[in-house]
Structure formats: C-alpha cells, structure tokens
C-alpha cells in the first residue's frame, strides 16, 4: 500500500488515496470458541493443498477428518494470515496491520460454516471497531 500511496495522483473521482485492507476474521465470545469455528477453514486449507476444491466443510466434517502430521503443519502455517479469537484478541491482531498499512477501510470475510455464528462474528467485530 505504500507504493500506492507514494505514487497516487489525484483525479476528478478521487482527490486523495483511499486504501481498503481485506482480511479473514473469525471472532467469537472466547478464543477457544473462535479456534473451534476455524477448524473447517483448516480443513479447507488441507484439501486445497491436495487439489480438492470443495465447499467449506462443516464442524463435524472437520472434526472427523484424519489429519496427517503434514496436514497439521500446513494448518498451523496457514493460520498466520487469519485473525481468530475473542474480540480483544482479534483487535490486537488487526490494529498493527491497520496501522502499518494505514488502511482507510477494513473489508472482512468470515469463513464460518454456521450462519448464526458468522453473523455473531461480524456483530462482535463491529462492536470492536465502533468509534475506533
């Protein structure tokens, strides 16, 4: 984003640069619950690495999957770009990223199988950043 801001040229449509940061967030009431909700994402990471492009798995499918040690290593490595946790945890992971990129807006996706849990994740995240 630094390059974008450094080379930005005003236009009739945009007088100044405006950057949107896109990221993945799974937010729940507790870190443990958020980690549990992220298990289907872990399984999708494993499946995609094996060339399997399937819809987001359910919590039950993720729990029943027979993970290899390589699968587990891949899951741990790919959790890094995700913000997973309770509201305070998610804020603590996102704020340095927002500050470093000087993002004007945050665009979030939440790959959560349950519609209600996904909606709750967005509600918690909205409370975290309301007035921030």
Predicted regions and their residues:
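An alpha-helical appendage that flanks or caps ligand/catalytic pockets
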Residues: 1-102, 130-132
């Amino acid at each position: 984003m630094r390059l974008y801001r450094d080379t930005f040229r005003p236009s009739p449509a945009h007088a100044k640069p405006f950057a949107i940061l896109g990221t993945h967030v799974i937010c729940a009431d507790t870190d443990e619950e958020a980690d549990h909700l992220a298990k289907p994402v872990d399984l999708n990471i494993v499946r995609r690495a094996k060339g399997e492009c399937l819809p987001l798995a359910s919590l039950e499918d993720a729990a029943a999957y027979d993970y290899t040690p390589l699968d587990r290593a891949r899951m741990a490595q790919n959790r890094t770009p995700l913000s997973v946790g309770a509201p305070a945890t998610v804020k603590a992971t996102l704020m340095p990223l927002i500050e470093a990129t000087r993002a004007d807006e945050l665009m979030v996706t939440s790959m959560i199988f349950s519609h209600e849990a996904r909606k709750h994740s967005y509600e918690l995240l909205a409370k975290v950043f309301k007035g921030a």
